[in-house]
Amino acid sequence: MSDGHPAEPEQSGNDPAPGTASTAVPGDAGGSRAQSRSLWLRRTLNLSQKEAVASATMTATGDNFFNAFAIFLQASALQMGWLTAIPQLFGALCQILSAWLGNYLPRKPMVVATAVLQTVVVVGLVVLAVAQPEQGVWWLILLAVMYFGCINFIQPQWRAWMGSIVPQRRRGAFFASRTRLTMMASLLVFAGGGALLSLSETAGVVWLGFATLFAVAATGRLISSRLLHLMHDPDPRPHRERRKGFLNSIRQLRASLHDKTFRDYSFFVAGMQGVVAISAPFFAVYMLRDLHFTYFEYSLNAIASIVTQFLTLSFWGRFTDRFGNRIVMQFCCLTIPVIPVLWMISPDFYYLLLVQVVSGLVWSGFSLSTANYLYDIRPQRSDFAVYAAAQSALTAVAIFAGATLGGLIAAGAPVLFEWLGFLQSWMRSPLFVVFFVTAILRTVVALWFLPRANEPVPRRRPKVLQLILRVSRFNAITGVSLDWLSVTRKPSAHKKTASTDSFDTDPEPQDE
């Protein structure tokens, strides 16, 4: 199966798994085929749950310890900005490339090969922690580019793969279970990593702590690669007709930019993420370098936001179902600019934990309401793997610009402090200049969009708690990243069930 051409996993008469000895069925007996399919399906779903835990050991380190590692390597303010900017832009381009290549190449080998490559990249981080070369920060930026490039390259193919495997009736429970496993494993690794780094700092061997942490991450990704290799793909060959569909989707995307509602939404999401990126890399700098938090305190601070985001997603889901997305977007848009200001009030560890709880609540609502909003305003019958990838590319460009600007501001902030001595009387850190600028620009973006945010007519979609909002990544500062993995039915005489990857291509999803 290729992106947007779903298999029909609910039909017991599907062909057995091609190329797999365990699915070779003698004769054409429908019962034998159904039994064979049940065996590989159960095995693959079980492997996928194990793979979630294995891969979480890597993502928990990559998404949350890169900035801390850069600070250990004595990264400059500008380099901290580039560490966020360049990998995000390259990753979005890799996602578009993956969506295109998926029309020509089988997806399972693409996923497995990229996962193995990512393992090598993380091993490179181990070597970097041990060697600590003179230009270590630049090597870190290069490895981060490859790391996030691999993550984004895998994403479209993984979604399509899972969309063809997980049966409709089990989809909500399966992804809810997978998300819980990912969350628990990630938080354990995150907290354990912070404790490990704090202990190694006390012993004067921080490099060993980072090397051990990245070695665990590499081991997790290697195990993940093996589990992905063992999983079954029921539709391994790309569909030739999808190539035409890809080009049609690009044309639809260009046409959709003439839709004022979608255009305003796209610029809003990209703009907000861009101005947030101005300060995103520097909260770690503020905690570790200015406030002298231990690595464990740094980890707990981030965990407070992440846990709050997970715990409040269901609340926001029920709230948006009842009152609509616009009111949630309004609340979150007006609260997001306040968050960096709250960071400037007190350096107390417990106070900043409370700030992160507030941040998690707001970012959870923002992520869910904007995902719902996009779902309701999207063009009909569009290939949303391509559509979402292009949307991500626009946001990545904004993040690149914002993080680069943040690095420039942070680099010039100490000089500004010297020129304007009165700033030192109420600013504990030059980084407060960055926080102040991002707060102002967040307000500007919010005030620009709010008058333009019309409540669209909601489309019928599965209830939030039953479906299939997959948390693909999480970040303490910029919020969770959500993927829709919803279910639709094609209006055909045979009533075929259509499952999609990230977003639906059919016009009207049905409640499960």
Language model features with spans:
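Hydrophobic core of transmembrane alpha-helices in multi-pass small-molecule transporters
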Residues: 53, 121-122, 135-154, 351-366
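Intracellular juxtamembrane helix-capping segments at the cytosolic ends
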Residues: 153-166, 365-380
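Structural signature of the two symmetry-related core transmembrane helices
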Residues: 109-125, 218, 327-342, 439
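Glycine-rich segments within core transmembrane alpha-helices of 12-TM secondary carriers
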Residues: 90-92, 176-194, 392-407
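Transmembrane alpha-helix termini and helix-breaking/packing motifs in multi-pass membrane transporters
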Residues: 67-72, 100-104, 126-131, 186-208, ...
